[in-house]
Amino acid sequence: MLHIIIKKMQSNKTLFICLIIGAILVTALICSIPLYSSGASTNILKRDLEQIKINTGAFPGEVLAEYPVSFEKSGGIPLDKVNSFEEKEIKAFKQRMGLPVILDKKSISTCNTDLYKLTKLDSQKNYMRLADKLWAIKDFEKHIKIVEGRMYREESADGSLEVILSKRAYSKLDVTLGEEVALLQHGEWYGKGELPKKYIKVKLVGIYEMDNPADDYWRLSQLDYGKAIMVSYKVLTEEILKQYPNWLDKVYWQIGFDYKQIEFFQVKTIRAEFNKLRGQLFNRVTSSKVSATFDKTLKNYEIKEAQLVFTIWILISPVMLMLILYICMVSQLIVIDDQNEISGLKSRGASKWDILKIYLWEIVIISGIALAIGPLLGLLICTMIGSSSGFLEFVGRKALPIKINSQILSYALVAQGIFFVTMIIPVLIYSRVGIVEHKQKAKKKKKIFWQRMWLDVVILLICTYWYYNYARNTQLIQGQSMDPLLYLVATLFIIGIGLLFIRIYPWCIKLVYIIGKNKWSPTAYATLNHLSRMKGSEQFIMLFMIMAIAIGIVNANEARTLNTNRDRNIWCNTGAEVVVRPIWKDFNAFFSVKDMKGNETSIKRPDYWMGGNEYEYEQLEQVESITKVMTEKPERIMVDENMIEVPSTVMGIEPRSFGQVAWVDSKILPVSINEYLNILIQKQNAAFVSSKIKEYSDVEVGDSLRITFRDSKDEYLGEMKVVICGFIDYWPSLANKVYMPDNNNNDPYKDNIMIVCNASYLTNSLGTLRYNIWLKKAPGITDQELLDTIEEKEIEYKNISFATSQMIESRTDGLNMGVNGMLTLGFIVIIAITLIGFIIYWMISIKGRALQFGILRAMGLKQKQVIIMLGLEQLMISGIAVLIGVIIGGITSDLFIPLLYKTVSNVTEVYPFLRFYARLDYYRIYAYIIIILMSGLSIVIKGIRKMKLSQVIKLGEE
């Protein structure tokens, strides 16, 4: 049986090779989902964990278990209970986590103890208490160095306990090196009267400092080294706590796991084990505490991973649909080619199962090849996705940490299931037909299924209804996650219009044919006559090309629009290349002035002076220009006697320098920003106000606004009166809306009235205010170079933002890379299968029309005229399909991309949505199409030249 199957596949090897390619692509695409999501998710996770270290200074892989032994009510020796819990639970927890332990720190503190100085100071009546506890850390000696004195001994000497202090603790505690103090049971003595005779001598023998302050060991810091009195861990556990067991207060296990080794599939296990340890310790002592620096990050990661996988499935769905159609087409061609054989077997008594077995073996062989090659191709696909920075744009980015895992097998099997169903459907349809029925059906002309069922009209009606409802609810969907139906409906819309065009296209050809019936040349006549009787194969290839072009254009426009809007929103939100937020400290003065009603009012005139010296930045060679920008939230805005109760933001700028530094897109302002700045220069009290203000008050240019301010302590700052000189909708770093949720389930996004005025006028009205410093870098200077210079000059700042760095971070985000990569990949795969389908069509077309060519040659047509006829056919089929694909792609982009952007954008974004279409993207698409058309034409010419013309002509004459 296997020999027969292989021989059968060899006899029709071209179609089977095409089918194998389809199966491999399906497997590779589906396998790329878990491969990419695992690599991208792991990358996101590691970056987020590193951010913890940068933002907080904490070690990202730390788990802290706090065991308050003194609060435990059960009987037994406290230290024994601790050792038992550590042996049974802590060690098992480390193993179950599945990560290398690179840091391990165990700390113990005492309670019920007091440390007193042995001598009284002259000014004191009582003995001074220094501390109420001792600390010990296992292997602490390996991470410190003694700067004065010596290290404590690992055993008590002469009945005294040796301790050490950090340099900071030594400067704070009133004790000298070599001095002895008394350690007593709490409650036995309170420092009054004579010192008890029975006490433990504690001697300070050394001062220490960190051996390597940059060591992650010091990030696992639970105790305050500036106060802690450190004793030998061995002495405390083996001597002191055995003699005084109730002195044991708390034990801290601080475990530093190698967070760089965390893989995506370990996240659920890690969180489960962490929660299990928390429960185990809670069951012992309710006041226990188990925390992890990565807990919140891992929780958010699971959400991000689900969103990433979901997004990739959404983006890949149009490609999968095209692949399914492609496999259906090829498998149908194979079955049609075998139809005479199937009918013969059926007529000779073969059962449906006998016929199915042949094709099942074929499916098994093809699936085996796909399983072997598909996952490897999936790896290559993931590499391509990871290096994508836009539509058909790639950069030399560091490869994602992608590994083949067990999950891939399940996805690969799903792919084979899809392939099996797709291929078996045509077999089931044709296996029911006998030889007599086959001959009868061959003579009948019957409309295709989708034409009989009017699927094109049904699909368009569904898409129209969905689009209408979705567009009506754009306010509700803004900022929500991607809707899978959005991509599906866009693809269905393309299919619907494509099918509708294919339905009416033959009628258009007939109309053209009738108009010039007596004028057409023989080649044109033969072409139009053939196309007016267009069959399923021509319709299928036209639909393929229409979908390929339309989806390519939609993908290109979508990627270009999303990427450009995202980048420009970062620029607009930041306002400039670099924004520095200085460190401020205010010294307040109070003055008495008259308020709006003429009453004497005490107002606060703040004078912020510490930090914010822009001259420090002006002196840097790496900075070309700087400007100061002030933003304040006013208490109220008055128009005559009417108060506008809407959130608002006042921005004070220096017009001349602002124009040199600020990033402004001319597309979002009705006139050049210089027009606005010139007015501010000419008129000190001029202001530009959001056009939104017209919805709350009847104001026009020339009207005045009175704006009052209060600080965070609700103290009155002052009043400013400005004249409206124009209205704006967008301004650098200011948003039209702000997020202000309430308890009444109202819309949390409120209008924000933007007011832009002169910084000098604002400070004259309110006093010296805090400001941010906006910088424009000198040509060729990178963000890191500027930051290094600021650090080198020791210029203090509270926060610094780089627009370019934010853009790079956004582009390397796993979700954005996935979107760009899948859009690019989708187009490449569609173009590839369209090329294969196109080649198959022309190969079968030439092979099946040998008789027609013979008749035409016998009638006197030259070979050149036959080639021209086929060229016209290609133009009328492929050329028109390309044109219609471009039109449909443009229409779909205009309709669906704004809706898509609504779902991924934020209501409070500064930059307005704009559609961006690049000619370069279209040129790339056209280049691929030209390759397809030239391939088809070369096959036509090659096929005709290979024909045995003498036999063809003789056949035509007969």
Question: What is each of the regions a protein language model found here?
Answer:
Residues 2-323, 333, 387-395, 405-408, ...:
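Membrane transport/envelope proteins' first extracytoplasmic loop
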Residues 12, 325-367, 433-449, 836-878:
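Interfacial "coupling" helices/loops that link adjacent transmembrane helices in transporter permeases
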Residues 14-32, 36, 269-284, 303-320, ...:
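Alpha-helical transmembrane segments, especially those used as permease/efflux helices
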Residues 334, 356-376, 412-416, 452-453, ...:
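Selective transmembrane-helix segments that form parts of the transport pathway or gating/packing helices
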Residues 375-409, 465-486, 816-822, 883-951:
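Short helix-loop junctions at transmembrane helix boundaries
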Residues 397-398, 431-448, 907, 943-958:
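Short cytosolic juxtamembrane segments of multi-pass membrane proteins
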Residues 476, 480-487, 491, 496-675, ...:
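Juxtamembrane segments of multi-pass membrane proteins
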Residues 771, 796-889, 893-898, 908-912, ...:
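C-terminal transmembrane helical bundles of large multi-pass transporters
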